[in-house]
């Protein structure tokens, strides 16, 4: 008789609400802290995962504080502070270029409605570019000094965000999953949408319509061919 293999669990978690989420700014790579509501969302996520019997072998996280703080809260609630955590710029949010830090209506007044909104509609459309000497540009931030400057964005389409994370997904995350490791990935809405795209085989048009809520664990159960057999929110 063939032994029935348990599905492999993978959890994707968007960070809790940030101050700029609350105030409706384009955030991107802006390093913004959690709001009080976001801290509560992270606590709730940790309790939900613990109550549902989840545990993890390793965690992945972006370089941005709102994701890092969310992960720290979840790990504390679950008693998993000892776990190794892989932090990488490749899991950072999509870069919103010259829109970063702006509210939508201010951006529309400055850049026009189509230049502002096309990147919210089209998979291959990027926001207006930052100038290379802009202090918001990752090339001017010491934390990214070790990254090849040619790989650091001045703005990103969703297609470019997918291309940024794909090497990490294919060369690091998927091999861990193939070994049966239970992973928690804490990141950002647009970045997580590109992971969902690869997991579920969605099109660019489909992920542009997808929404991932702050602080709600998105759980996958994968067979040993890494095909999702179950997908649900806690």
UniProtKB/Swiss-Prot annotation:
InterPro entries named in the record: His_Pase_superF_clade-1 (IPR013078), His_PPase_superfam (IPR029033), PG/BPGM_mutase_AS (IPR001345), Phosphogly_mut1 (IPR005952)
Residue spans crossing the bilayer: none
Amino-acid positions noted as binding substrate in the UniProt annotation, renumbered to this chain: 14-21, 27-28, 66, 93-96
SMART domains linked: PGAM (SM00855)
UniProt keyword annotation of Isomerase present: yes
Keyword annotations of the record: Gluconeogenesis, Glycolysis, Isomerase
Any Pfam family the entry gives: His_Phos_1
One GO biological process term: gluconeogenesis
Domain of life: Bacteria
Catalyzed reaction equations: (2R)-2-phosphoglycerate = (2R)-3-phosphoglycerate
Pathway given in the UniProt record: Carbohydrate degradation; glycolysis; pyruvate from D-glyceraldehyde 3-phosphate: step 3/5
Family: Belongs to the phosphoglycerate mutase family. BPG-dependent PGAM subfamily.
Subunit note: Homodimer.
Name of this protein: 2,3-bisphosphoglycerate-dependent phosphoglycerate mutase 1
Originating species: Nitrosomonas europaea (strain ATCC 19718 / CIP 103999 / KCTC 2705 / NBRC 14298)
Gene label: gpmA1
